[in-house]
Amino acid sequence: MNNKSIMTDFYELTMAQTYFDSGKKDEEVYFDIFFRNNPFNGGYTLSGGLEEIINYVKNFKYGEEEINYLRSLKIFNEKFLNYLSNLEFKGDIYAVPEGTVVFPNEPVITVKADAVTAQLLETALLACFNHGSLVTTAAKSRKHSCNGVRCP
């Protein structure tokens, strides 16, 4: 499976089916992405991962292979699986610009989408932001510690 849309916590899928089954799939929801601690016990974080998030969302879909895998688990009903096979992101994402200094517990990305899509995006977007910000912050820290001299 090369499709990254399946990159989610299992409970996100079961929650999405719950929204679907309860008739709440089309409700517009918002969720914020934030982080709890600065990397390396530092005083700040630089936002990162936005390009990866944009690419992930642009390519967000469940293909035949992913649907067949989910079907094999015998947990998800056929109506929900059919819905997933046609799902596309039709929402909005608001984010602080790449490289912005950000601090713990403040929203850095806001997602507006239908309840099912928002639920399914959460894990991957958190992973992309956290990894991207870790790398961006580490690079800035390394550059700063070298004080203009080429570091080994």
Task: Please state what every model-predicted region is.
Residues 1-152:
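Ordered alpha/beta subdomains of enzyme catalytic regions
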